[in-house]
Regions:
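Basic/aromatic recognition patch in beta-strand/loop cores that engages polyanionic ligands
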Residues: 36-80, 85
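Arg/Lys-rich, positively charged N-terminal/basic patches that mediate binding to nucleic acids
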Residues: 1-22, 106
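Enriched for short, Lys/Arg-rich terminal
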Residues: 68-110
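Sequence/structural signature of beta-propeller domains
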Residues: 9, 25, 32, 45, ...
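Amphipathic alpha-helical interface surfaces
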Residues: 6, 22, 26, 58-61, ...
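Alpha-helix C-capping/helix-to-loop hinge sites
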Residues: 13, 17, 33, 84-87
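Compact soluble domain cores
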Residues: 18-38
Length: 110
């Protein structure tokens, strides 16, 4: 069974941006195919999933930043934001995400 870990930042954003049923659907989709979404260059292996929210319109989707480790089969949800807030992480945010990826690798041995 795949283990899912959520950062406090992710949980706060999910509570603000997603209904519980949409959050569950999103998380199940990523857990089922974690390697499906593109890697974000310069982040040490984090990925970005795009997800459409019901009734959100063209700019109403969200982006999930996550890290997947095959062994020990962990998906770590690092961040979530609305598309209308930003399209991609800034250079500074990518540097921070790279640090997060390194910490996850140290913690879980990936």
């Amino acid at each position: 069974m795949r283990r899912v870990i959520r950062s406090s930042r992710y949980e706060r954003a999910a509570a603000r941006l997603l209904r519980p049923s949409v959050q569950q659907e999103l998380e199940e989709s990523i857990a089922a195919e974690p390697e499906r979404h593109p890697l974000i260059p310069g982040t040490g292996g984090l990925r970005k999933a795009r997800w459409r929210r019901p009734g959100g319109g063209k700019s109403g989707g969200v982006r999930v930043i996550y890290y997947f480790m095959l062994r020990p089969d962990v998906v770590f949800r690092a961040d979530l934001y609305a598309k209308n807030e930003k399209e991609n992480p800034t250079h500074a945010e990518r540097n921070q995400l790279q640090k997060i990826a390194s910490e996850i690798q140290r913690e879980f041995g990936g």
